[in-house]
Amino acid sequence: MKPDQLLFEDSKHPWEDLGGGVRRKVMSYNADVMVVKVQFELHAIGTIHQHPHTQVTYVASGVFEYTVDGRTYTMQSGDSCYVPPNAVHGCRCIAAGVLIDIFSPMREDFLP
C-alpha cells in the first residue's frame, strides 16, 4: 500500500509473520496515522514494549489480557484501550483473535 492511498483492499495484501503465532498487516496510513491488523493464535504473546507513538487498540475478535503501565485488563471483541506515548504495554491472547492498532504518527518501523 502507498501512503495516502484511499482504499485498502485486505485480500490483496499479504500478512507479515512475526513468529510465535503472531502476524501483522499494515493497512491504511499516511504520515499522521496508521492502521495495523494483528492476528494472534491461542496463547500467542504481544511482547512487552514501548514506543513514542499514541496508540489505540480495538479488539476485532478473540480475548486478550492486555497490560498497560503495569495494569492488566481482560479485553474481548468490541473493547478498546488507549495506550499513551511511551507507556510500557503488551498482551497475551487467551482466545485466538485479531487486534486493530491505530498509531499516531505512523510507525515507520512497520514499513518494508
List each language-model region with its residue ranges.
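A cytosolic small-molecule/anion-sensing beta-strand core signal
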Residues: 60-61, 76-77, 95
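Histidine-centered metal-chelating micro-motifs
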Residues: 45-46, 65, 81, 85-90
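Short acidic-glycine-tyrosine-enriched beta hairpin
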Residues: 70-85
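A short, N-terminal "cap"/entry segment at the start of jelly-roll beta-barrel domains
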Residues: 1-32, 112
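Ligand-binding loop in jelly-roll beta-barrel domains
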Residues: 85-109
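Short, conserved beta-strand element in jelly-roll/cupin
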Residues: 39-41, 50-66
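Short strand-coil-strand connectors
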Residues: 67-71, 94
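Conserved short histidine dyad/triad with adjacent acidic residue
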Residues: 19, 34-50
